[in-house]
């Protein structure tokens, strides 16, 4: 819960100072290994795909976010967080980002951002938002990608007690072009400003800062 409500202004300032010190010692300044490029086009993408280092991939648990996450930033999620401290059975846990290479589309990194919502008598639900990491363009630093969200998912995981079997997830594709994922879909620039075997720092274009720990 502290990852969603990270404290007052002074606490955020101290945490940000620690993160900035980490970034100054970043052992992986180019997490995409100078992503391969087939031409010199600087208008649309850095190349024809991403080439992530192995340390980037896998499951990452959110430790800190200065302004919530794409899953928890809604009014509903914030209201649930407030209820968690007042009513038993309500809460928000398991905020995880999973990264893997898309085997069907080489050069594309897929991401899943998910969290577990406990709604008391209404059960526990896993909410996920999926998307692709794509080249951000020659004008962007090599540690920066374009994140395009393309799918929303929700799954019932418990109802008063743990369910005896896993129910299927309901998936909803976000509107947009299938051939050009950027068109008509939510997108944002994302920078990996620190990466080692255990921790990762990501920064959004709007100033949001995220600290992850490998699961």
Label each region the model flagged.
Residues 2-215:
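Soluble ligand-binding/transfer domains with enclosed cavities or grooves
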């Amino acid at each position: 819960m502290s990852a969603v409500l990270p404290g007052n202004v002074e606490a955020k300032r101290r945490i940000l100072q620690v993160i900035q010190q980490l970034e100054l010692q970043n052992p992986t300044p180019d997490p995409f290994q100078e992503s391969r490029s087939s031409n010199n086009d600087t208008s649309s993408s850095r190349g024809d795909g991403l080439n992530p280092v192995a340390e980037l991939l896998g499951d990452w648990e959110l430790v800190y976010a200065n302004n919530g996450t794409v899953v928890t930033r809604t009014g509903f999620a914030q209201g649930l967080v407030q209820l968690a401290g007042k009513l038993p059975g309500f809460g928000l846990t398991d905020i995880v980002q999973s990264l893997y290479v898309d085997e069907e589309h080489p050069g594309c990194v897929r991401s899943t951002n998910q969290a577990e919502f406990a709604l008391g008598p209404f059960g526990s639900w896993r909410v996920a938002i999926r998307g692709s990491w794509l080249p951000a363009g020659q004008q962007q630093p090599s540690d920066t990608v374009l994140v395009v969200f393309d799918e929303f998912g929700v799954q019932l995981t418990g109802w008063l007690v743990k369910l005896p079997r896993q129910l299927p997830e309901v998936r909803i594709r976000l509107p947009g072009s299938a051939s050009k994922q950027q068109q008509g879909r939510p997108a944002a620039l994302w920078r990996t400003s620190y990466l080692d075997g255990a921790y990762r720092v990501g920064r959004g274009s709007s100033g949001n800062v995220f600290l992850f720990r490998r699961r």
